[in-house]
């Protein structure tokens, strides 16, 4: 090997070494940052996240998918006359209603369910993953587990599920469905959401996102095996994107939210992504007009921005609209008191 060749290899080795050192330093910096966050006082450290349970059931849908359903709260002849049905969002599970279950279960009959391919429900391997199918799933949950009047509560994709129910089963609203709460959700045009990025960057992201998500979905098993290695980054992203007051949010709560997201297989993320981007139910909102409706959104929600909730409120002028300050997308976890109080108020407004 000539002196020149050795010099070239030496330079290349130095560059690779420097790059590796840079990556390692960045990883250590992230780990250090997360470590410091976890050392802060944590008021939620003893909260039993993921431990609350009701009476567990399995519902086989008309297309053969097993849904996990839990019924909580009063039962029997002396039970509550009204059922509150909680519909969770994309990449979450029924556990995301932890605080609402904890605070409402003594007085109200609750039905919580994991949407297909989420939580403890079966993966819809060959089944439909459209928003319309989620609306049909909800109709089957109501038929099986809700014998009387109910209030529907939906967060994010769960709100879209309720809109699909209204579009496909409008006859249920007014008689069976007596009230609706739509939290941090959208009636459509999610492909135009900027995610807080500059317009040109956002446009570029949306242009490549469908192909990228589809590609990751095809390699889902491989991606899932590497997700744990990026847990510090996932923690920081969840903290930043999910919570408006991210500097003061409980690390235990962030871990809980991130664990639900991480438990959602990459293939499921890819399966549902096109349905979310194509979701358009603004024309179905009129079905909700006869029933008391509450619309809530955080003012720092970048995933389903406040403008989307305002558009729904304009379509439902009788709805009670609330924009919660210093709050992002995981509103029921970040501001549980405000959300639970709004649900109690909605229940009071519902005639049984």
Where are these regions (language model features)?
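Catalytic active-site module of serine/aspartate enzymes centered on a nucleophile-bearing elbow/loop
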Residues: 310, 314-352
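Flexible "cap/lid" loop of the alpha/beta hydrolase fold
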Residues: 171, 175-222
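Acidic catalytic loop of the alpha/beta-hydrolase fold
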Residues: 276, 299-304
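Short beta-strand/loop motif that positions the catalytic acidic residue
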Residues: 288-289, 295-297, 301
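Conserved HGGG/HGGXW glycine-rich cap/lid loop of the alpha/beta-hydrolase fold
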Residues: 65-123, 141
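Conserved alpha/beta-hydrolase catalytic His-Asp/Glu region
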Residues: 217-287
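Active-site loop/oxyanion-hole signature of alpha/beta-hydrolase fold enzymes
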Residues: 73-76, 118-175, 187, 193, ...
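Hydrophobic alpha-helical topogenic segments used for membrane insertion/localization
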Residues: 5-34
């Amino acid at each position: 090997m000539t002196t020149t060749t050795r010099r070239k290899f030496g330079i290349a080795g130095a560059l690779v070494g420097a790059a590796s050192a840079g990556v390692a330093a960045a990883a250590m910096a992230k780990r250090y940052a997360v470590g410091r966050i976890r050392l802060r006082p944590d008021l939620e450290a003893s909260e039993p996240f993921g431990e609350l349970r009701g009476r567990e059931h399995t519902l086989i849908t008309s297309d053969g998918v097993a849904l996990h359903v839990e019924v909580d709260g009063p039962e029997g002849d002396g039970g509550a006359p009204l059922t509150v049905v909680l519909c969770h969002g994309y990449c979450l599970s029924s556990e995301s209603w932890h605080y609402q279950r904890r605070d409402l279960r003594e007085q109200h009959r609750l039905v919580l369910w994991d949407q297909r391919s989420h939580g403890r429900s079966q993966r819809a391997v060959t089944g439909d993953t459209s928003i319309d199918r989620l609306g049909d799933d909800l109709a089957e949950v109501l038929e099986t587990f809700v014998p009387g009047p109910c209030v529907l509560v939906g967060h994010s994709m769960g709100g879209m599920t309720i809109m699909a129910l209204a579009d496909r089963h409008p006859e249920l609203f007014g008689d069976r469905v007596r009230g609706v709460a739509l939290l941090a959700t959208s009636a459509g045009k999610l492909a135009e959401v900027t995610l807080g990025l500059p317009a040109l960057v956002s446009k570029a992201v949306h242009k490549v996102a469908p192909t990228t998500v589809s590609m990751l979905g095809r390699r889902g098993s491989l991606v899932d095996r590497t997700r744990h290695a990026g847990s510090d980054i996932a923690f920081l992203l969840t903290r930043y994107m999910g919570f408006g007051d991210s500097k003061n949010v409980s690390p235990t709560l962030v871990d809980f939210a991130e664990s639900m997201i991480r438990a959602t297989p990459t293939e499921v993320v890819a399966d549902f992504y096109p349905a979310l981007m194509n979701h358009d139910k603004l024309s179905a909102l009129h079905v909700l007009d006869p029933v008391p409706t509450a619309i809530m959104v955080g003012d720092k929600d970048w995933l389903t921005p406040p403008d989307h909730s305002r558009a729904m409120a304009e379509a439902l002028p009788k709805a009670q609209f609330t924009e919660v300050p210093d709050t992002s997308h995981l509103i029921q976890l970040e501001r549980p008191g405000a959300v639970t109080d709004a649900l109690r108020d909605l229940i009071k407004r519902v005639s049984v």
